[in-house]
């Protein structure tokens, strides 16, 4: 369209030149219009040099090993359930499907199975309640950072509309329990139960599953929905075991120590000095609550987060409920995912607030408004300029909010927007204006060590009564399955899950089916279609699992399924597409869990998400199921 228009304009200029003023002709024959982003005055080299300098100062030789899993010996108490689960008698039972995990992925799989007519299943989870991440993360201020209307599962089916755009933990768990009640899932669940081993028995084509209570389940299918944000990760700093004050991980908040609840009101901190190590997504939500209630708060920072504001207003629930057509939630999820991947959708999707500036949709709209046609070869430059602009705005916002210039400078993020998990909070930056709050920036080095009573950073001791580790979860993609789950998983050829994947990284079909582990259905990000809304991924994978299991049980012809080696290899190759570009970007970022603490080259390309996104993954898997011949599967 753009080239056709230019031909028309050039022809018109030649024809009408005698009767058009020279000033107008100069506009027609002058420089071509440029995208508004290309008019911005950025010193690209200086910005990228600053990014690299900030990255370099944070790099460590020990990489991910600088952190300690809470499963390791001395740190085990940091992962224990505050609910103090009780002992019970062992259970011996057979079932068609055993679901490992009662978080969103496990619950969605259970509901999808139920909807497909498969009701002989059991759910097992180490937590004392449902919700997975949202069971463990009950710290003050915990809230979702994806719009509630697409994040909370089964809103349409339960008839519930969230109270606000980004709802808080208690409301999320209320919806979880609403789902549990509607589909009678509690009756089929075993909570406060940790699976210790799973072994395939080829003689009966079933899994033997054992737990810490001495349970023994025999099951045909296993849905492995163990999740990612549940096993606390601690900084590997000397002295943790010797600290005499109170200390816990943010994912195991202990209100017996702080008082209050998830809204705050931590009255028992009124005369205490509190330290928090970490400034990631959880800390950003926590700090304003601690700032309000603690006598003194030290915030120990390695790398600042990018902070954005959001409208978190209340919904007009009755009118919103009336306006939503059938199928609205799944459609809204689809629109959200499509826009993020640059696809054209029929309507605007305000669920993208805070993310829309870097989408192709936004860049093309800005071009259209300026009368500019974007050529494919311009897209990388425009995306980078959009990122520069956004990060400049984020840093400018820090200057506007934080009164102390030295503190403001230390809170500014110097990296590309998606290098670290984006965070959103309207009160985090302002908390540093409180006289009782002190930022302890470690210039990328982290805390040095703990004494019996203090945190040592930058050569200075900071005495604290309570220390909170807001240092994330054991999300390292290279961490072995046993370390992350505590499950000794042994397949049909006598090899463990870790021995299989240690060869060359994940080998799967669709990210779900795994050779040597028959009837094991894996729910995880590797080789699966994902989007910024994890709930959407659980829906897509849940549909695939439920329809696959239901068809297998209805047909009854085969008892066990596992992908062929050729099918795994082909799917692995498809997942490696674009890995070079992903690696280059990750190598430009400061250390974090996105890039294996600054060593992304150690991550096999096969650990990547399916590169074409959740919508294409859904289409591929749906077509595979509709063919009905289990293509790429060994069957017996």
UniProtKB/Swiss-Prot annotation:
Site note Transition state stabilizer, residues: 421
Coiled coil: none
The protein's annotated pathway: Mycotoxin biosynthesis
Catalytic reaction list: ketocytochalasin + NADPH + O2 + H(+) = iso-precytochalasin + NADP(+) + H2O; iso-precytochalasin + NADPH + O2 + H(+) = cytochalasin Z16 + NADP(+) + H2O
Cofactor remark: Binds 1 FAD per subunit.
GO molecular function term, any single one: monooxygenase activity
Cited Pfam families: Pyr_redox_3
UniProt entry keywords in alphabetical sequence: FAD, Flavoprotein, Monooxygenase, NADP, Oxidoreductase
Top-level taxonomic group: Eukaryota
Required cofactor(s): FAD
Residues that, per the record, bind FAD: 125, 133-136, 145, 151, 195, 534
UniProt KW Kinase keyword: no
Keyword Flavoprotein attributed: yes
Protein purpose: Ketocytochalasin monooxygenase; part of the gene cluster that mediates the biosynthesis of a family of the mycotoxins cytochalasins E and K. The hybrid PKS-NRPS synthetase ccsA and the enoyl reductase ccsC are responsible for fusion of phenylalanine with an octaketide backbone and subsequent release of the stable tetramic acid precursor. The polyketide synthase module (PKS) of the PKS-NRPS ccsA is responsible for the synthesis of the octaketide backbone. The downstream nonribosomal peptide synthetase (NRPS) amidates the carboxyl end of the octaketide with a phenylalanine.
Family statement drawn from the similarity comment of this UniProt entry: Belongs to the FAD-binding monooxygenase family.
Name of protein: Ketocytochalasin monooxygenase
Organism: Aspergillus clavatus (strain ATCC 1007 / CBS 513.65 / DSM 816 / NCTC 3887 / NRRL 1 / QM 1276 / 107)
Organism ancestry: Eukaryota, Fungi, Dikarya, Ascomycota, Pezizomycotina
Gene: ccsB
């Amino acid at each position: 369209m753009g080239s056709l228009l230019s031909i028309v304009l050039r022809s018109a200029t030649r024809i009408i030149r005698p009767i058009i003023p020279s000033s107008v002709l100069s506009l027609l024959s002058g420089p071509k219009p440029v995208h508004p982003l290309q008019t911005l005055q950025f010193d690209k080299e200086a910005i990228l040099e600053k990014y690299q300098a900030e990255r370099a100062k944070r790099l460590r030789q020990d990489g991910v090993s600088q952190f300690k899993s809470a499963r390791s010996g001395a740190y085990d108490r940091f992962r224990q359930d505050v609910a103090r689960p009780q002992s019970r008698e062992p259970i011996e039972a057979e079932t068609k499907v055993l679901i490992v995990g009662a978080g969103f992925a496990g619950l969605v799989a259970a509901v999808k199975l139920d909807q497909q007519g498969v009701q002989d299943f059991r759910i097992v989870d180490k937590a004392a309640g449902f919700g997975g991440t949202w069971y463990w993360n009950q710290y003050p201020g915990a809230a979702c950072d994806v719009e509630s209307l697409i994040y909370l599962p089964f809103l349409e089916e339960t008839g519930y509309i969230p109270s606000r755009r980004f709802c808080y933990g208690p409301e999320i768990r209320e919806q979880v329990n609403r789902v549990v009640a509607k589909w009678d899932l509690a009756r089929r669940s075993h909570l406060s139960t940790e699976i210790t081993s799973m072994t395939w028995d080829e003689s009966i084509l079933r899994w033997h599953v054992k737990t810490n209570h001495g349970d023994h389940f025999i099951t045909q299918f296993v849905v492995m929905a163990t999740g990612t944000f549940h096993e606390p990760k601690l900084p590997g700093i000397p002295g943790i075991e010797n600290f005499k004050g109170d200390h816990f991980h943010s994912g195991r908040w202990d209100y017996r120590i702080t008082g209050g609840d998830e809204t705050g009101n931590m009255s028992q901190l009124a005369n205490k000095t509190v330290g928090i190590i970490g400034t990631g997504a959880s800390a950003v939500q926590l700090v304003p609550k601690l700032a309000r209630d603690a006598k003194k708060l030290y915030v120990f920072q390695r790398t600042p987060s990018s902070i954005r504001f959001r409208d978190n207003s209340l919904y007009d629930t009755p009118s919103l409920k009336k306006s939503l057509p059938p199928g609205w939630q799944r459609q809204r999820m689809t629109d959200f995912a499509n826009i993020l991947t640059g696809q054209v959708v029929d309507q605007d999707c305000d669920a993208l607030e805070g993310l829309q500036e870097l989408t192709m949709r936004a860049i093309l709209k800005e071009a259209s408004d300026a009368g500019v046609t974007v050529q494919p070869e311009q897209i990388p430059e425009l995306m980078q300029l959009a990122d520069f602009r956004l990060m400049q705005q984020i840093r400018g916002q820090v200057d506007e909010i934080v009164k102390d210039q030295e503190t403001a400078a230390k809170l500014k993020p110097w990296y590309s927007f998606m290098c670290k998990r984006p965070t959103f909070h309207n009160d985090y930056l302002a908390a540093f204006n409180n006289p009782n709050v002190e930022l302890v920036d470690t210039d990328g080095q982290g805390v040095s060590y703990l004494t019996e009573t203090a945190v040592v950073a930058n050569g200075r001791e900071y005495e604290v009564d309570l220390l909170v580790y807001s240092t994330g979860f054991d999300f390292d993609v290279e961490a072995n399955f046993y370390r992350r789950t505590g499950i000794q998983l042994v397949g049909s050829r006598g090899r463990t899950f870790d021995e299989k994947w240690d060869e060359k990284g994940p080998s799967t079909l669709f990210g779900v089916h795994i050779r040597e582990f028959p009837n094991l259905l894996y729910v995880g990000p590797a080789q699966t279609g994902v989007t910024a809304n994890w709930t959407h991924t659980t829906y897509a994978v849940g549909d695939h699992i439920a329809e696959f299991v239901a068809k297998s049980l209805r047909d009854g012809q085969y008892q066990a399924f596992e992908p062929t080696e050729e099918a795994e290899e082909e799917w692995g190759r498809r997942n490696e597409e674009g890995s070079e570009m992903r690696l280059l970007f990750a190598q430009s970022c400061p250390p974090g869990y996105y890039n294996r603490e600054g060593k992304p080259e150690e991550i096999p390309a096969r650990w990547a998400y399916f590169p074409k996104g959740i919508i294409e993954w859904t289409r591929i898997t749906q077509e595979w199921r509709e063919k009905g011949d289990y293509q790429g599967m060994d069957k017996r």
